[in-house]
Amino acid sequence: MSKRSKAYRAAAEKVDRDNLYTPLQAAKLAKETSSTKQDATVEVAIRLGVDPRKADQMVRGTVNLPHGTGKTARVAVFAVGEKAEQAQAAGADIVGSDDLIEKIQGGFLDFDAAIATPDQMAKVGRIARVLGPRGLMPNPKTGTVTPDVAKAVADIKGGKINFRVDKQANLHFVIGKASFDEKALAENYGAALDEVLRLKPSASKGRYLKKITVSTTTGPGIPVDPSITRNFAEA
């Protein structure tokens, strides 16, 4: 067995699989069970009671995490003229139009999020098959198709995350790093969960939050009580 697998097993032994932890307890345990010396990413996985094959049960949204993600996202912006200048001033990592599209068609994908002004979307549509599967396609519903590119860049740089239910009815998103204080992780979790709950489709019947786990990138999954979104005071 590798050292990594031994570390993982040791970490997994700290998790009571039959217990449902509060968000704060889960955040603390995620920090303790990170099986890497690097500053691991803390992630949330949620199984939703929806049928993503039906358009009226799609769950997709954005949320600004109060404590950010611990990573400064690289942002690409499709814009020209004054809007391009505003995007650059706001801190966009790469700004362009046809030139940026050609670069992406050539294999360039060194960015974490993409924003476009509405007038650029007809052009951006040419690379939808490249950006879409990677979750990078600008979309009005996530605030990434907008004339206010400066605000969109600032939001993403400041810790805005996007989430979308997959074909198996799962949601995945980041709430920070293992180096974060557990209260900060729990507050990020609470902010994201509040938005997921707000977006519950009216067509969704039965239990909406079926299963929630918190983990670091290489650590074991920690089951969280779906009935609790905010519990910051508990030690």
Curated annotation (Swiss-Prot):
Keywords of this entry: Repressor, Ribonucleoprotein, Ribosomal protein, RNA-binding, rRNA-binding, Translation regulation, tRNA-binding
Function: Binds directly to 23S rRNA. The L1 stalk is quite mobile in the ribosome, and is involved in E site tRNA release. Protein L1 is also a translational repressor protein, it controls the translation of the L11 operon by binding to its mRNA.
Residues spanning the membrane: none
Protein name from the UniProt record: Large ribosomal subunit protein uL1
Segments forming a coiled coil: none
GO-annotated biological processes: regulation of translation; translation
HAMAP family assigned to the protein according to its UniProt record, in alphabetical order: Ribosomal_uL1_B
Protein's organism: Mycolicibacterium paratuberculosis (strain ATCC BAA-968 / K-10)
Any GO CC annotation of this UniProt entry: large ribosomal subunit
GO MF entries: rRNA binding; structural constituent of ribosome; tRNA binding
